[in-house]
Each structure stands twice: as C-alpha cells, then as structure tokens.
C-alpha cells in the first residue's frame, strides 16, 4: 500500500515535470523557431528521461531505454531535416550522384537505349573538341580554303581568254601600226598553277622594241639611283630620225615614257571599246576602271567578281620591263624589271627535284594574306622570293616538314621586315620592300607575329 502511494506521488511529480517541459518547449518555439525548439526539446527530453530512469523501478528501465533511444533518434532526424541548409543538401546530392558505379554483370542483358538517349549521346560526342596538329590544319586549310576546284578555275580562265581575244582584235583594228604582240595570260592562269582564289587575273601586253634603237639604263645609273627601276632610252637619234620606231610617239625627252603609253591605252580601252556589248555576248558585265592610273577591267560573272589588270611590258633582249605609272612614281618614264617567269620556273624545278611542297606552301600563304587584312601589303612576289631564299637554307621540303617550313617562312619574313630589306633572289641589290611605308612594315610585322604565335586562329576560319 505504501509502495503504491509512493508510485502515485512519483507519477504525479513526473507529470508535473512533463507539463513544465511542454510549456517551455511551446514558448521556446516562439522565441527560437522550429529548428531551435527541436534542438532544445532533444536536450530537455534527455534530462527528463534521466530523471524518470532514476525514479522508476528497475523492471521498467529496459523498456524506457528503448523508447528513449527511439525518441532521441526520431527527434534528431527531424531536427537535422529542418536545420539542414540548401548548400549541404546540394553537397549531399552531388556526393550521391558522383558515387562510383559498380560494373554490370556480364551475364545480365544491357537495357536497350531509347531514341532520346541515343540522340543525347551523339550530341555529346559532337561537343567533344578534336585536337589537330599544325600539320593537319595546314593540309586541311590548303584543301578547303586555299585551293580552287579545277572546274571553276577552268571556267574563269576561259572567260579571261574570251575577253583577251576581244581586246586583241580591237587593238589590232584601232592601231594597226603598233607592233603589239599577241596578248597572253599572266600569273597563275598563264602557268596553270593552282590558285587560292579567282578574284584577280592579268593580261600581258608585250611591246617589241627594236634592240638597235633602244637600250636599258639600270636604275643605279639614273638620277634616282634606285636599282628597283630602270629607264628605256632611245639611241642613235643622230642616225635614225625620230619616227623611225613606232614607239617614238611615246618619247619624253630621249626616254620611253611609261606614263604616256598607259594614258594613251587607257583612253582607248575606256572610251573606244563597247564593253557592254562584249559583256552581253560573254554573259557577264565588264566595266573599265576609269579612276585608276592602271589599266583595269572589273568583271562580274555568274560565279563571282574578278579584276583583270592589263600590263604593258617592254621586251628588250632577255629583260621583261613592266610599265610603272602609279601616281606616286617619282618620274613618268620608269620601268620595273619583272622576274616572274624565273621565279615560278625555279620553284617548279625545285619541287620537281625533291618532291617538295614549295608551291603548296605558297598557296597557303597567299590564302592567309587574303584572309588577314593586316597582311594585305604582302604580295605574291614577296612570298616567292622568301621561299627561294629558304630553299638555299633548308633541304627538307617534303610534305611531312610542311609545318616546320611554314613557321620558318613566317619567322624569316618577320626578320626581313625588322631590317626593312628583302633582297631579290636574282639580284640582291634590289629591295622588294622599298615601296612599303614605315606604318605598312609595322602593320605587317604585327600581323605576321599574330599568325606565327597563334596560327590556329587563322587556319580555322571559314571561307
């Protein structure tokens, strides 16, 4: 009876403590929030269980310990879920997704991939960057960007030949007294070399000068003292009167004036030839350039646009002299020695002797100069002479050495620009950079350095 009364008092005392704890937790939720109240509830519940364990009989301790453990675990899980931050949850998710996967059992059949998963897999494969060597990029650039298909090249060549024929017939009819030789194709069209683009062509207009009436004065012996230019002098005027040569009409003083000749031809080509009618017959539009000091024809055909330059060339013995009549020329009777035939012939001989890639490298370089505005002052003559100079220094010009030779050409060009002097391969006194201004050289040097340091930026460009 006494024990029963003691238990009732202990139970009443325990109920009082529980009521007080519930009151504290209810108010703590208002002050601390749900998470804080949960943590406080765990601690308070632990204290309460300790008090109950101390006052309860030994037979009830095991059941109460199990209930206590379960209550604490549930309260802890609830508190963690309520208290956990989004950052921690993301971290747990990441760890879950990044967990190592076990290898599938070979005996089990793999599930068949759906159409969507196959598309996603192919898209992911396409996104994987493919790394190419410089050698591979150069060959790809040569094939897809620096080479014109043979069919297109032949069509453009035939169009230029048709225009040449019309011009030739008109000049013979207009000036029968002038001993013009037959016009012929110049440049890559004339040599049937591979081309990087079809936006330009040239027609050579040979002027046959009598060797006993004309002589070439080297540039060093003229008042300009410039080896890049020469003059054509009329000789034996004491014994052969003026007018003995059909070219005497273009004399200024005792010298054959390139400017007077070009201006006379310009008037004929611009004002006397019915280019609209010729263009209609050839299915194109032909317009002579009336603003330029040079002889140019602008041709628009179904496949694109083309500029045809007409170059008067005096032929004296073994010298080919191009008329130099630009507005900035220091005199009106200047002629410039052309080594084009020798340049191309020498490159072809070298490539044939060692199965080289000099002409292929030339195509790539011409394409890069076309794609980079900063390299517009670098012309084909510069590139041909650089390749000829390097051919005397480097012996390996096989296709496997294309990348090395390409970088070497750029490096040599930068070196020559730094000196401001690129000697001609056939006459080391001639400076092929003499026509460039200081700002042109600076721009070229910067552009070449960019190509040399980051060639992929140029080679990956689309046409």
Curated annotation (Swiss-Prot):
Membrane-topology descriptor: Single-pass membrane protein
Key words, A-Z: Membrane, Mitochondrion, Mitochondrion outer membrane, Transmembrane, Transmembrane helix
UniProt xrefs under SMART domains: Mab-21 (SM01265)
Principal place of residence: mitochondrion
Topological domains, Cytoplasmic: 48-463
Mitochondrial intermembrane topological domain residue ranges: 1-24
Basic and acidic residues: compositionally biased ranges: 89-98
InterPro entries: Mab-21_HhH/H2TH-like (IPR046906), MAB21L/cGLR (IPR024810), MID49/MID51 (IPR045909), MID51-like_C (IPR049097)
Compartmental location: Mitochondrion outer membrane
A GO CC term assigned to this protein in UniProt: mitochondrial outer membrane
BP GO terms, sorted: mitochondrion organization; positive regulation of mitochondrial fission; positive regulation of protein targeting to membrane
Region annotated Disordered, chain positions: 87-119
Membrane-spanning parts: 25-47
Additional observations: Does not bind ADP or other nucleotides, in contrast to MIEF1.
Family: Belongs to the MID49/MID51 family.
Role description: Mitochondrial outer membrane protein which regulates mitochondrial organization. It is required for mitochondrial fission and promotes the recruitment and association of the fission mediator dynamin-related protein 1 (DNM1L) to the mitochondrial surface independently of the mitochondrial fission FIS1 and MFF proteins. Regulates DNM1L GTPase activity.
Name of the protein: Mitochondrial dynamics protein MID49
Organism: Xenopus laevis
Lineage, uppermost ranks: Eukaryota, Metazoa, Chordata, Craniata, Vertebrata
Gene: mief2
